[in-house]
Amino acid sequence: MPKLKPSFCSASEINTPCAPCPESPDDALHEACGVFGIWAPDADVARLTFFGLQALQHRGQESAGIAVSDGVALTCEKGLGLAREVFDDATIAALQGQAAVGHVRYSTSGKDPDISLQMAQPLVALDETGGFALAHNGTLTNTADLLEAMGGGQETSSPNGACATGAAVSDTQIATDFIAHFARETKHLESALERFIHTAQGAYSIVVLAPDALYALRDFSGIRPLCLGELPGKGGFAIASETCAFDLVGATYLRDIAPGELVRIDSAGIHSKKIANEHPHLCARPAQCLFEYVYFARPDSVIDSANVYRAREAMGRRLFHEAPVEADIVIGVPDSGIPAAIGYARESGVVYSEGLIKNRYVDRTFIEPTQELREQGIRIKLNPLHYAVRNRRIIVVDDSIVRGSTSKQLVQMLRNAGAAEVHLRITSPAIVWPCFLGINTDTQGQLIAATQSVEEICDYIGADSLAYLSLEGLKSCIYAEHPQYCTACFDGNYPMPKPNPLHADAFLPGYKPTWNND
């Protein structure tokens, strides 16, 4: 049986979990991860994966990892920090192979180096199929069902040992154990991946590297993005969370991985199996996360054939028609608010100006989850351009309001800089419901819009006016090929069955969500 090369990671370092993000310290929405995979026997796959991770760095800054296959064995390297901090030329040169997967992660669960390293991906499992490395973006909502399918709390065949230890583990750890367990049982990794797709619920965009193949799989709703590209002249293919990674490695975007699809790439080419078509009774409704377009994705990416920058600019234009106000300038909150601010300015005729300067040398992970530093965080990252805002009526365009504390500090900073009026315009509807699908808002009590009206929020943050883009307005701005979206955080209409387990404090009294299996 092919063996795992322990060149760079100890067994304890390789087989470690990556937990979903808990509450954010800087009052912003965050996802957990970005994933990349490549099959290109004639290329430097580790270096191309490193480039891909750099393009996806906005999706995670706490840790980075790369696993490669030489056709016989897997080798893995990962560590804390940005991709450029984890990998140098010597490290990359030592990762030789025909295929690779990579991962970048964001979390605020703590800064203990041992804990953070345990959460780094890819995870690597050994089994009778030769082993595999797994990188995951999303959150599984039925981990209890997955554990039960492996025999509850009993020992499993996976070397990760999630069930054997009985310790608290992440959904990614459980997914890795599940696949390893059934790969050993069936002697066939692809069968285990199919069983995972049949069983798992929630959001997952996953790349899996085996010694002789690269796999990509996406949940039935297609909540998190995952796309397929080709490397012209290199006889290879790439998988990535976003198309911006293809631009950096010289790949051509072919298409998105479809919801409920399992793709295998090997020496014979691309093979696709549409599990959604074979088992329609298992399928949840398609539901791409709207916040990928509003905030998460890079503006130069394309998701479901929709250009992200174009969508954000359209959100700003639509915002003007829904919530006009007299002002002297329009400014955007860097970075996602800038295209929308430009759209608002163009449609309204109000002058667009830079009004907030972003410190691009501050890592998100610098801010610790303490109240004192949380309040300091906005001043560390943004500074008003006094010349532009002094004595002027300002329209400020931002992507969202979560708890309201960042917006409150932002408005106060602009007033301190001399702004005569501050009118806040948000390119998404009010976030009222928790997310269980890969965003760090899993309890409703942390959302200001769940307990306060627009007028009350406006008063709290100290703005002269506040307006959100309507849900229909937001959807009309995206121009996607398959315009079916997850709107759960706005309207409580969840695309998946009720999570198992469900956080006891997920919902406030009086709120009744709608589940896909209701």
Regions from the PLM with identified roles:
Residues 65, 395, 423-425:
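A structural signal for isolated positions on well-ordered beta-strands in alpha/beta enzyme cores
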Residues 157, 185, 322-328, 346-353, ...:
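Secondary-structure transition/capping motifs at alpha-helix termini
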Residues 45, 108-110, 142, 215, ...:
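Flexible loop/turn segments at secondary-structure boundaries
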Residues 197, 212-213, 230, 250-256, ...:
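PRPP-dependent phosphoribosyltransferase catalytic core
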Residues 349-395, 405, 432-440:
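Short, glycine/charge-rich flexible loops or terminal/linker lids adjacent to PRPP-binding catalytic cores
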Residues 2-259, 264-327, 333, 421:
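Conserved short alpha-helical segments that host acidic/polar catalytic motifs at enzyme active sites
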Residues 168, 173-176, 352-363, 460-478:
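A conserved beta-strand->alpha-helix junction
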Residues 330, 337-344, 348, 352, ...:
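Extended, hydrophobic alpha-helical segments in both membrane/secreted and soluble proteins
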